[in-house]
Amino acid sequence: MRSAHFHTTDNGLSLLHATSIFPATNNKYWGRMFVWFDTMPTAPMWAHWSIVGAVGSGNDTEVRLGGQYDGSKNRFGVGTDHGPTGDWTNLDEDPGNPVPVDSWVCVEWLHDGGADETRFFWDGVEHPSLHTTATDHGGPQSQQYVLPDFEDVFVGWWLYQPGTTPGQFDVWIDEVALDDSRIGCSL
């Protein structure tokens, strides 16, 4: 068995897409994967990256799971681009530890379009600071965070800013699972 290896230079992207699981019952699905980061960006300030994203119809919101360099460390984060709430990322505050490098980490997520809710788990532990709802999110509070009717989910590595330090990234992803209920980290 081999892991999927994603190699990028600077602000590159390397992704695998899954569409066959959609439409999901009640527009809700759980995901789980194991991720190994060889390094994380340390420049530019606020370098922003994704390892999971989902899009669909109904609106142009792209739901993201990834993280951001805050000037001292990379932290996991959830957020979006496009859609009525715009581009935002909530960073992990539980307790806000850096994303581990050179070790496997189990990442789990919920995208519930029926309830307009997302959740994030790291090594089996939920991080409530990364829980979003239609009215509790990182965008303008005057706008509801409405999730799309999911049609496509990607996993991989996507770094958005150019001029990164270091100049290349290697990420390995293994044991990706998508289901209508929580999967967990046990293999």
What positions do the PLM features span?
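A carbohydrate-recognition surface predominantly in extracellular/luminal proteins
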Residues: 23-39
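Short, aromatic/His-centered strand-loop micro-motif at the edge of beta-sheets
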Residues: 80-106
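Short surface loop/edge beta-strand patches of beta-sandwich-type extracellular domains
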Residues: 12-27, 93-96
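Flexible glycan-contacting loops in extracellular carbohydrate-active proteins
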Residues: 131-171
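Short carbohydrate-recognition loop motifs
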Residues: 1-15, 74-78
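Localized edge beta-strand/strand-to-loop motifs within extracellular or lumenal beta-rich domains
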Residues: 103-119
